[in-house]
C-alpha cells in the first residue's frame, strides 16, 4: 500500500448518511436497454432511503425496471480540505400512495431543470459505502508545462 492509499478513509454507514444529507445533487446510474447511463438528480434523504422527483422519461423508465440502480454523491470540506464520495446501491419504487406521497411532497426537493417533475421515486438501499480523502496539493500533480498555452487544435 502506498502512502496515498493509506490516507483514504472508508466511511461507516452512519457517516455516509450524514454526508448524503449535506448534499442535494448526485448522479443516478441506471441500465438503459443494453448500456449503463448516468443522470444528475436532485435528491433528499428520507428515513434511510433516497428520494428524487422527475418527469416521465428514460431516467424514470430505467429506474423502475427490474435492474438495480446506484446513486453517487460527493462533496468537499473547505475546513479540512478533504473530499468525500458516497455510493448508495439498491432498488427503486415509485411513491404514489396517499399519505406516502403527501409526506414526500414536503421534502426539500428542488429540481434545477424546469418542467413537469410530478413523479417521486424512492431508492431503497441494499448497500451504502463511502470514502473520505485529502485533496492533493496541486504541486504534487502540476507539471512545469501545466500552464503553457496550447494550440487551438490540441
Which sequence ranges carry the predicted segments?
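Beta-strand residues in well-ordered beta-sheet regions across diverse protein folds
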Residues: 29-31, 53, 72, 124, ...
Amino acid at each position: 500500500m502506498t502512502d496515498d492509499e493509506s490516507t483514504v478513509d472508508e466511511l461507516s454507514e452512519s457517516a455516509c448518511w450524514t454526508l448524503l444529507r449535506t448534499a442535494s445533487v448526485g448522479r443516478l446510474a441506471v441500465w438503459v436497454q443494453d448500456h449503463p447511463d448516468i443522470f444528475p438528480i436532485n435528491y433528499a434523504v428520507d428515513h434511510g432511503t433516497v428520494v428524487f422527483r422527475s418527469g416521465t422519461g428514460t431516467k424514470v423508465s430505467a429506474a423502475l425496471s427490474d435492474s438495480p440502480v446506484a446513486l453517487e454523491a460527493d462533496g468537499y470540506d473547505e475546513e479540512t480540505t478533504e473530499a468525500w464520495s458516497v455510493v448508495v446501491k439498491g432498488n427503486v419504487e415509485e411513491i404514489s400512495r396517499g399519505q406516502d406521497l403527501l409526506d414526500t411532497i414536503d421534502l426539500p426537493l428542488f429540481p434545477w431543470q424546469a418542467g413537469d417533475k410530478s413523479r417521486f421515486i424512492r431508492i431503497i438501499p441494499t448497500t451504502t459505502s463511502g470514502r473520505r480523502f485529502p485533496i492533493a496539493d496541486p504541486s504534487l500533480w502540476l507539471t512545469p508545462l501545466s500552464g503553457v498555452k496550447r494550440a487551438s487544435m490540441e
